[in-house]
């Protein structure tokens, strides 16, 4: 029974860590939000095919 609790605890901790850790590949969906989004990453905003792309400065 303690193994079951250990597995559940590990799964919950993993879920919390994945929720807290931001996905660095996710970019802003629209070009309007692009400058603000890239400013948080200290990068240059570029709009490519209506998608925000943050390029290193």
UniProtKB/Swiss-Prot annotation:
It holds the Pfam family Toxin_6. Expressed by the venom gland. This is Potassium channel toxin alpha-KTx 8.2. It is found in: Secreted. Negative results: does not block mKv1.1/KCNA1. Does not inhibit rKv1.2/KCNA2, rKv1.4/KCNA4, rKv1.5/KCNA5, rKv1.6/KCNA6, rKv11.1/KCNH2/ERG1. Shows a very weak inhibition of Kv7.1/KCNQ1 channels (4% at 10 uM). GO terms for cellular component: extracellular region. Belongs to the short scorpion toxin superfamily. Potassium channel inhibitor family. Alpha-KTx 08 subfamily. This toxin inhibits rKv1.1/KCNA1 (100% inhibition at 3 uM), Kv1.3/KCNA3 (human, mouse and rat) (IC(50)=269-467 nM), shaker IR (60% at 3 uM) and activates the mouse capsaicin receptor TRPV1 (EC(50)=132 uM, at 20 degrees Celsius), a non-selective cation channel expressed by sensory neurons of the pain pathway. In vivo, intraplantar injection of this toxin in WT mice hind paw shows significant acute pain, whereas no pain is observed when the toxin is injected into TRPV1 KO mice. The keyword Transmembrane does not apply. Keywords: Disulfide bond, Ion channel impairing toxin, Neurotoxin, Potassium channel impairing toxin, Secreted, Signal, Toxin, Voltage-gated potassium channel impairing toxin. InterPro entries: Scorpion_toxin-like_sf, Toxin_alpha-KTx_8/9. Disulfide bonds join 31-47, 34-52, 38-54. One of its GO terms (molecular function) is potassium channel regulator activity. Has the structural arrangement of an alpha-helix connected to a beta-sheet by disulfide bonds (CSalpha/beta). Residues 1-28 form the signal peptide.
């Amino acid at each position: 029974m303690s193994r079951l609790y250990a597995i559940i605890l590990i799964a919950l901790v993993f879920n919390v860590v994945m929720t807290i850790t931001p996905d660095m590949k996710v970019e802003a969906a629209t070009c309007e939000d692009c400058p603000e989004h890239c400013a948080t990453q200290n990068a240059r905003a570029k709009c490519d095919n209506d998608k925000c792309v943050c390029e290193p400065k």
